[in-house]
Amino acid sequence: MSITAERKKAIVAEYANKVGDTGSPEVQVAVLSERIANLTNHFKFHKKDNHSRRGLLKMVSQRRRLLDYLKGIDQNRYQTLIKKLGLRR
């Protein structure tokens, strides 16, 4: 269900604005998107896992808040990120 340390490092390296950047909205959204994708796959086999579903909903809302923040700060970075991640908005 969770992502490995190597995968997380790869995501951070891909979306970071500078070396060691783990706190930028782009990196946080990318990591959350990976975790959301893993949990979505988990629910295909464990439909009644409501405890994890609550965590998924929290992650989705956190990602939404980060995306709204990024959109307010810099529209171009927001558009680039959602295209790169393949999000619907």
Curated annotation (Swiss-Prot):
Gene3D superfamilies: 6.10.250.3130, S15/NS1, RNA-binding. One of its GO terms (cellular component) is cytosolic small ribosomal subunit. GO terms for molecular function: rRNA binding; structural constituent of ribosome. The keyword Ion transport does not apply. It comes from the Bacteria. InterPro entries: Ribosomal_uS15 (IPR000589), Ribosomal_uS15_bac-type (IPR005290), uS15_NS1_RNA-bd_sf (IPR009068). GO terms for biological process: translation. The keyword Nucleotide-binding does not apply. Pfam families: Ribosomal_S15. Keywords: Ribonucleoprotein, Ribosomal protein, RNA-binding, rRNA-binding. Belongs to the universal ribosomal protein uS15 family. One of the primary rRNA binding proteins, it binds directly to 16S rRNA where it helps nucleate assembly of the platform of the 30S subunit by binding and bridging several RNA helices of the 16S rRNA. Forms an intersubunit bridge (bridge B4) with the 23S rRNA of the 50S subunit in the ribosome. Part of the 30S ribosomal subunit. Forms a bridge to the 50S subunit in the 70S ribosome, contacting the 23S rRNA. This is Small ribosomal subunit protein uS15. The gene is rpsO.
